[in-house]
Regions:
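A contiguous, mid-protein "functional segment" used to position or interact
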Residues: 1, 8, 195-227
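Short aromatic-enriched loop/helix-cap "lid" or pocket-rim segments at secondary-structure transitions
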Residues: 4-9, 82-85, 151, 177-180
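Conserved loop-to-helix N-cap of the C-terminal "lid" that shapes the substrate pocket in Rossmann-like
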Residues: 71, 111-121, 137, 145-149, ...
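Conserved catalytic-site region of short-chain dehydrogenase/reductase
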Residues: 1-33, 40, 77-80
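NAD(P)-dependent short-chain dehydrogenase/reductase
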Residues: 64-111, 119, 154-155
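Mid/C-terminal beta-alpha module of Rossmann-like enzyme folds, strongest
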Residues: 123-186, 191-193, 211-212, 221-240
Length: 240
């Protein structure tokens, strides 16, 4: 919902917003942000996203005096049943025993707040069961998000992969690995409010979360894989 999403997706041009954003930070001005975008999703999912936006629902709930509503703004949720398979692009390369994973040097330092699915579920239950949550808005996510290169290293540790992670200038990165976002804008959210007001703490630490996520991803790979996103010949040409 935040303007930083418009910045990173280039739908709301402007200088990068300061991060981490709080619950009081500016929201997107443009509603229905997925309309008109060529998204790498199945056609049914593309159609659903045409009318997808959380901001109108938030306004409806928070402005209705008859509803004791709570809004939770969730992070990039990973783990079992992750329909977006957030670990797959890295884990597949690791399991294919690639010698190296290439990252655009800008992407290597980019931050995005994640949340393991069970930890996010705990936050949801807490908001439902704690009366102090009524009428409040809370960001949910990990307390200390990693830059992308460290995120990949954390996955590699769990996957028992010992290759190299190589940041490269944009002009040397194969075209399928060039970021389609504005990496000057980090997607970092502050989760201080829910921790202070409701005492939220993650029951599953990062290592255990990634162990469970990697195990699920290996057992449940995507049914369709875009071969163009795994152009190993182009990646090998850079490594020579």
């Amino acid at each position: 919902v935040y303007r930083i999403y418009g910045r990173v997706n280039r739908t709301e041009p402007g200088p990068p917003d300061p991060v981490p954003v709080t619950e009081d930070s500016p929201l997107r001005d443009k509603l229905y942000p997925y309309r008109g975008l060529d998204l790498p999703f199945p056609e049914s999912e593309k159609q659903r996203l045409q009318d997808y936006d959380k901001i109108p629902i938030e306004r409806l709930v928070m402005n209705d005096p008859a509803i004791q509503g709570t809004v939770l703004r969730l992070p990039a949720v990973y783990g079992p049943n992750d329909g977006q398979h957030r670990l797959f692009e890295f884990l597949k390369r690791m399991d294919d025993q690639r010698p190296a994973i290439l990252l655009d040097e800008r992407m290597a330092q980019w931050h995005h707040t994640h949340g393991y699915v069970e930890n996010v579920a705990v936050a949801i239950v807490l908001a439902i069961t704690d009366e102090r949550a009524a009428g409040r808005i809370y960001n949910v996510g990990e307390a200390h998000p990693l830059p992308m290169i460290e995120w990949v290293r954390a996955i590699a540790k769990i996957a028992d992969w010992h290759g190299n992670i190589i940041p490269l200038p944009s002009d040397r990165v194969p075209s399928h690995l060039v970021p389609d976002i504005d990496t000057r804008q980090d997607l970092l959210v502050a989760t201080t409010r829910i921790r202070k007001e409701l005492g939220y703490r993650e029951p599953v630490d990062l290592d255990e979360a990634l162990k469970r996520a990697v195990a699920w991803e290996r057992a449940n790979p995507p049914k369709e894989v875009d071969a163009k996103q795994f152009d190993y010949a182009a990646e090998d040409a850079v490594l020579v």
